[in-house]
């Protein structure tokens, strides 16, 4: 699942992403951000790892990536205003798309998933 969003005035493709709310676990945040940006409820099933991403403005982000299964579309919700659309695309469709990626990490995460590098959610702890 990919979201189409506007970044610096350009429509780009990205995975649902966001931030942690106070007292929220990474897994809870991943499910919440997916719901807010796509209106899809999801079960987070595995962890793909962490990537350090430095944005063009110099800010450094730690990006945690997860595997999820979309379980239910919530048609009572309105997705975040920053999201143009939600797309279901294979890797090949993504590469053939004329829409740019928000960052190279988008394709890297897909490649990690295809390579089978996902690990148990037990690795992600919230104390």
PLM features: residue spans?
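Short, well-ordered strand-loop elements centered on a beta-strand within folded domains, enriched
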Residues: 1-4, 74-78, 121
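N-terminal strand-loop-strand
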Residues: 1-15, 42-46
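Unchanged
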Residues: 20-43, 52-104, 126-127
């Amino acid at each position: 699942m990919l979201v189409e969003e506007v970044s610096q005035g350009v429509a780009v493709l990205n995975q649902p992403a966001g931030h942690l709310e106070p007292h929220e676990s990474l897994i809870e945040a991943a499910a919440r951000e997916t719901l807010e940006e796509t209106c899809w409820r999801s079960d987070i099933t595995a962890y793909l790892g962490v990537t350090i991403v430095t944005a063009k403005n110099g800010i450094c982000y730690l990006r945690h990536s997860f595997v999820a299964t979309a379980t239910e579309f919530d048609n009572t919700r309105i997705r975040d205003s920053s999201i143009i659309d939600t797309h279901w695309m294979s890797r090949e469709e993504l590469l053939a798309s004329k829409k740019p990626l928000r960052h190279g990490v988008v394709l890297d995460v897909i490649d990690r998933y295809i390579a089978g590098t996902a690990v148990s959610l037990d690795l992600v702890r919230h104390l």
